[in-house]
């Protein structure tokens, strides 16, 4: 991961703000990252973080789906490391929407990559 990439830098700052309890700062930093995204790799990362601050299940789904769609368009392997998290988030999105069949499918995809879903 290129830590000099401005989108990644903004998302890291957003994560730091989020973990420090500065939710509004985190939200703003993630939106800045989304607005700054120049390619599918950047958009994948930014959408992944923007999804975290959505309230409605449909919006959570839409942003998680955008992250996965952008990851699928990245030509090189740079987005490969994000797939387990993207699949888990898609599983959770489908779960929130009541589509347990699709949720399980995405949880299974994540599990094949070595990440198990932990029920809440």
Specify the residue positions occupied by each region the protein language model found.
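Flexible helix-coil transition and linker loops at the boundaries of alpha-helical arrays
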Residues: 1, 33-40, 71-80, 116-117
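Alpha-helical segment of the N-proximal tetratricopeptide repeat
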Residues: 8-25
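TPR repeat positional signature
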Residues: 10, 44-47, 87
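Conserved small-residue packing positions in alpha-helical repeats and bundles
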Residues: 14, 48-51, 84, 91
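TPR-repeat structural position
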Residues: 23-24, 57-60, 100
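Helix-adjacent hinge/juxtasegments
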Residues: 44-80
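TPR/TPR-like (Sel1-like) alpha-helical repeat modules
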Residues: 62-72, 96-118
């Amino acid at each position: 991961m290129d830590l000099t990439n401005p989108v990644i830098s903004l998302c890291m700052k957003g994560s730091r703000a989020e973990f420090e309890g500065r939710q509004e700062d985190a939200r703003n930093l993630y939106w800045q990252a989304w607005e700054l995204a120049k390619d599918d790799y950047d958009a994948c990362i930014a959408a992944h973080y923007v999804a975290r601050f959505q309230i409605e299940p449909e919006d959570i789904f839409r942003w998680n789906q955008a992250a996965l769609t952008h990851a699928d368009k990245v030509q090189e392997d740079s987005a490969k490391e994000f797939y387990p998290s993207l699949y888990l988030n898609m599983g959770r999105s489908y779960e929130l929407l009541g589509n347990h069949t699709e949720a399980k499918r995405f949880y299974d995809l994540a599990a094949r990559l070595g990440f198990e879903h932990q029920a809440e």
